[in-house]
């Protein structure tokens, strides 16, 4: 992302814009705290990581302090990454999110949100680390090291009576309770007996730990072996049916309550498990689906599943059956008052009924394992009075969606997705309690604003950070009145500095483009927009977003410090060169596709830059004068400039890089091959080429620029402008290239090595037909009847019986975009015959189609304009 940002910033600067490219450190949250804890307990993994990345032993000792972690990595990023890569960052604006001034800035935002009624309190089931407290679980993985894409699932915990106890079975499909035939427990598990209010539950110890964080007054009072439960009976609520308790190793104590209800008519896992233990239990069908009698039985048999060990096949069967039942299923007479209701319409009716009658409650669990940065498993815990930002506010959502329509968003697909994301985006819990780095919440002591909520308006603070860094502004001066004036224009300036900062804010804002990884599509970017819309004046709402995809490992996982598996960037920069890596990032794939790190591919980009360097040295040695080929080089170069500018304006960096580092290189190679040696033209175009390289590979560009005697730094030069393109010059050389390709193809097919080559240009009558066809096409009158009438006006044309056949063919081609024949092809090919002769080591003869010329291959009559 930084490489893309830098390329865009450099390009815009070379196009004459003033560019502000600031950078900072998002130090809020758990990452620094977690790393410090690992250093404190001498975790070998983190110590080895630090040493591998060049951290001195005396510095490692200090990193048990989270603030030292922030300081150290801030220095590393600036010196080992950003400066080494030549990023065009304004270092006077560096800031971090735990500085006193930034904290004041964030608190001001929350005062504004509260003023607008966009803060609220309500109970919240939050991801919680037993060591670190509340954490955010999202794709940015700011606080966690595993499970960023986990969802919070809402299980219905149904209470089955068992000898004065409750067997709580957790399910995502409470409507299937009518088909329960038995219960599953794991005979090898020691279950806890837990007091929950006035009830005694039998639940896995892991489940007890989870439920105690979601329901008040949970107390473990005893334990019981799963073996003791097997063979006994419990009662299904609502229907009052007694069912047996059976053994199952798949009853995982780590999943929900560790107790599983069995619905073998509709759950392939349950059906095959009963078969495995040879239980004499008849499935109870509760859902009618066209084509099925006992759905689970039939899909298992159809897929040939024989055992519980076929987990992948069972999961596939489960998903297929669930999909069919959801879309086509209707509850039958076994479902009491719910009979006749479609599965797709049942929603929460059964769940609500069970809860209302005291037969069920709710339990929340992650869809997959989530691990905190500290290494502890994350659970879900109730926060009774959690504060939220009300992103569900209808007016805010609609205004944000409307603004998205006016934004420049890349890729285009994300612009289409974003309004839907904003519709879906609900209230966000915005504070946490724990050992966090961040800003104190102004309305509740000892609580910290969470990392996403403190990084929504952050670009605005870069305007202020410069004055803090230069010692002109102190955090003590930054009260709400200060921020109101600087960002909203409210009130009066207390001094000249306030006015100066306000004017600078008005000059730079709004943000033209905010770049970030794809993990922020549903995390950061929605709140970035909504907080601007909520707080800032409309003229300061952001203009653009650029989403970049990831550099991945072979496994497809994002390469990151927390994931490991990546060669340290400073080492890779030493090995390949930073310009090589910049070009690799920009060209190996679209910014909107994941890139799998490939050492061999990176090496090829290193060689490409070396080839360009060598070619430019060779070009500078040429001291000749003008030749026909000069016009083509200038025209084709100008054509590439047009393509590059068009691509850069759309942030299509790969397309621009392809033109700069491959297409232009090939054109200069062809120019040399054609004998081009115009020193003045070469120097002029080389300077432009280097200017276009500068945003992508600034170091090699500066080196060649200096070698050529360019004025100052190439980064301060202007980007080449579009110039008129000589289409005749392009068409002439394209004809020559096509002629050479055609000859090569004939030689390849015939396997004949020629000593003489005859080239014929089109006869005059074909040129006349072609010219008249294009004239009529331009006037919108081209058809066979009109064309033939026009041609027959010329007595000379009447002599050629093949005109109708050729005219018919040409009419079709022109309507498809055929080229207008406006060049003297004979003269150009004849002038190039020595070059063609050298290419094929043969004598070359060029004749006009009307000439009385030798025609040993009987090919002359086939000649047509431009082919």
Language-model regions, residue ranges each:
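Protease-associated
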Residues: 174-183, 189-259
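Alpha-helical recognition segments enriched in aromatics with Gly/Pro capping
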Residues: 159, 170, 240-244, 248-253, ...
């Amino acid at each position: 992302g930084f490489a893309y940002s830098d390329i865009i910033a450099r390009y815009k600067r070379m196009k004459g814009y003033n560019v502000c490219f600031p950078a900072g450190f998002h130090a809020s949250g758990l990452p620094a705290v977690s790393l410090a804890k690992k250093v404190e307990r001498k975790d070998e993994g983190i110590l080895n990581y630090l040493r591998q990345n060049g951290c001195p032993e005396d510095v490692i000792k200090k990193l048990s302090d989270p603030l030292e972690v922030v300081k150290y990595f801030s220095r590393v990023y600036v010196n080992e990454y950003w400066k080494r890569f030549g990023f065009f960052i304004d270092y006077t604006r560096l800031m971090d999110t735990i500085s006193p001034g930034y904290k004041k800035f964030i608190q001001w935002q929350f005062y504004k949100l509260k003023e607008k009624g966009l803060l609220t309190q309500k109970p919240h089931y939050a991801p919680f680390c037993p060591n670190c407290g509340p954490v955010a679980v999202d794709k940015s993985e700011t606080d966690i090291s595993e499970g960023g894409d986990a969802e919070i699932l809402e299980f219905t915990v149904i209470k089955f009576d068992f000898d004065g106890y409750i067997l709580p079975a957790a399910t995502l499909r409470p409507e299937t309770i009518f088909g329960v035939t038995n219960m599953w427990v794991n005979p090898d598990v020691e279950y806890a007996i837990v007091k929950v209010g006035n009830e005694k539950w039998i639940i896995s110890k892991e489940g007890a730990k989870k439920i105690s964080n979601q329901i008040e007054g949970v107390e473990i009072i005893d334990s019981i072996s799963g073996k003791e439960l097997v063979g006994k009976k419990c009662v299904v609520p609502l229907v009052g049916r007694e069912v047996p308790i059976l053994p199952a190793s798949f009853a995982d104590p780590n999943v929900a309550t560790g107790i599983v209800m069995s619905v073998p008519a509709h759950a392939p896992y349950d059906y095959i498990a009963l078969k495995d233990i040879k239980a004499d239990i008849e499935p109870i069908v509760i859902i009618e689906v066209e084509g099925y009698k006992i759905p689970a039985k039939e899909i298992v048999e159809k897929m040939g599943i024989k055992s519980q060990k076929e987990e992948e096949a069972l999961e596939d069967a489960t998903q297929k059956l669930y999909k069919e039942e959801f879309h086509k299923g209707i509850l039958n007479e076994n479902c009491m008052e719910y009979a006749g209701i479609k599965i797709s319409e049942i929603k929460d009716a059964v769940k609500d009924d069970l809860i209302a009658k005291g037969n069920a409650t709710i339990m929340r669990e992650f869809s997959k394992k989530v691990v905190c940065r500290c290494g502890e498993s994350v659970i879900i815990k109730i926060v009774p009075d959690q504060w939220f930002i009300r992103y569900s506010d209808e007016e805010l959502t609609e205004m944000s969606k409307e603004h998205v329509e006016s934004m420049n968003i890349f890729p285009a697909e994300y612009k289409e997705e974003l309004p839907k994301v904003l519709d879906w985006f609900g209230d966000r819990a915005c504070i946490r309690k724990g050992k966090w780095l961040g800003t104190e919440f102004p309305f509740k002591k000892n609580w910290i604003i969470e990392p996403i909520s403190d990084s929504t308006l952050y670009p605005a603070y870069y305007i202020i950070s410069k004055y803090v860094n230069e010692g002109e502004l102190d955090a003590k001066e930054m009260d709400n009145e200060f921020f109101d004036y600087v960002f909203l224009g409210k009130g009066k300036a207390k001094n000249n500095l306030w006015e100066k900062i306000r004017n600078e804010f008005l000059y730079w804002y709004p943000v033209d483009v905010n770049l970030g990884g794809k993990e922020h599509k549903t995390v950061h970017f929605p709140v970035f927009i909504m907080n601007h819309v909520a707080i800032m004046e409309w003229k300061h709402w952001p203009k653009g977003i650029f989403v970049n995809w990831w550099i991945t490992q072979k496994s497809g996982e994002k390469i990151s410090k927390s994931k490991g598996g990546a060669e340290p960037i400073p080492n890779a920069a030493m090995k390949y060169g930073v310009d090589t890596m910049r070009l690799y990032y920009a060209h190996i794939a679209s910014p909107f596709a994941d890139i799998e790190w490939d050492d061999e591919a990176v090496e090829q980009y290193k060689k490409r830059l070396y080839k360009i360097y060598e070619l430019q040295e060779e070009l500078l040695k040429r001291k000749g004068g003008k030749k026909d080929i000069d016009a083509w080089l200038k025209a084709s170069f100008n054509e590439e400039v047009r393509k590059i500018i068009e691509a850069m304006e759309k942030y299509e960096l790969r397309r621009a890089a392809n033109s700069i580092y491959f297409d232009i290189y090939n054109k200069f190679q062809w120019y040399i091959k054609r004998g081009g040696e115009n020193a003045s033209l070469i120097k002029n175009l080389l300077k432009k080429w280097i200017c276009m390289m500068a945003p992508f590979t600034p170091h090699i560009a500066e080196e060649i620029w200096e070698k050529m005697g360019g004025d100052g730094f190439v980064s301060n030069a202007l980007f080449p402008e579009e110039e008129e393109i000589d289409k005749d010059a392009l068409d002439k050389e394209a004809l020559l290239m096509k002629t050479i390709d055609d000859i090569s193809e004939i030689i390849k097919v015939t396997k004949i090595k020629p000593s003489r080559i005859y080239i014929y240009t089109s006869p005059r009558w074909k040129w006349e037909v072609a010219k008249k066809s294009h004239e009529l096409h331009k006037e919108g009158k081209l058809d066979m009847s009109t064309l033939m009438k026009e041609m027959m006006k010329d007595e000379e044309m009447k002599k050629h019986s093949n005109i109708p056949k050729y005219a018919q063919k040409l009419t079709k081609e022109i309507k498809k975009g055929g080229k207008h024949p406006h060049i003297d092809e004979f003269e150009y090919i004849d002038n190039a015959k020595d070059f063609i002769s050298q290419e094929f080591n043969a004598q070359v003869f060029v004749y006009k189609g009307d000439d009385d010329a030798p025609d040993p291959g009987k090919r002359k009559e086939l000649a047509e304009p431009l082919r």
